[in-house]
Amino acid sequence: SQFIESMRTELRTKHYSYATEKSYLHWVRTFIRFNDYKHPKDMGNSEIERFLNHLAVNRQVSAATQNQALCAIIFMYRN
């Protein structure tokens, strides 16, 4: 999508590593999918909390993985 491509461009402009780019785009896509494909501008803290809780409780990801997902979401909203 155009949104994902603009995020990819922003990551590359800021010289993030390829591994970080791949990871951030994965988590942003997963976040959007989890929220029924709503545009991020139409989502807020409650959707982010629900997503992170889902990762911890249902998918049982590690704290580091949960933090990586959060960092990706923060990057998306700041850029």
Regions found by a protein language model. Name each.
Residues 5-79:
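N-terminal core-binding DNA-recognition domain of tyrosine recombinases/integrases
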